[in-house]
């Protein structure tokens, strides 16, 4: 894309991670090669992204919220021998998956705003499909300001505003 080889880009990304400017979240898979190959990038400090043209666009606010959640998950689970992943198939994606010893403990979706029915259904359906696939009952949807409990398909989804989720003590 920019005339830089994959090898060079991987090296640069590695340097940025070593400098604690970026963190990588790997794709959840039982195959090590797939985990190593697919990594999502998050900035450690969202203030580093203020030079982006779309700083205050709704899309960027969602990206920033997802970054904040990622950093908090890494902080919460750093000493608990848990790993943070994302999961993606052709038809759905889970933003964050918390696993201990290969067993999925929690599925988390992040969406700045779920007032649009389409967005709301996309996030809920991803959690429900993930719950079924990984036999996980701990389902959370983090938003900017919405709080409610959703009961659907014999599952309970806790919808929490980011402020409340960030301030809660972890079990």
What are these regions (language model features)?
Residues 53, 119, 150-152:
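Short glycine-/acidic-enriched loop or helix-start segments at secondary-structure transitions
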Residues 104-116:
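Active-site ExK catalytic segment of metal-dependent nucleases
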Residues 115-125:
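Active-site-adjacent loop/helix micro-motif of nuclease/hydrolase catalytic cores
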Residues 137-143:
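Short, hydrophobic beta-strand segments that form beta-sheet elements in well-ordered domains
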Residues 144-171:
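Domain-level recognition of nuclease-like catalytic cores that cleave nucleotide substrates
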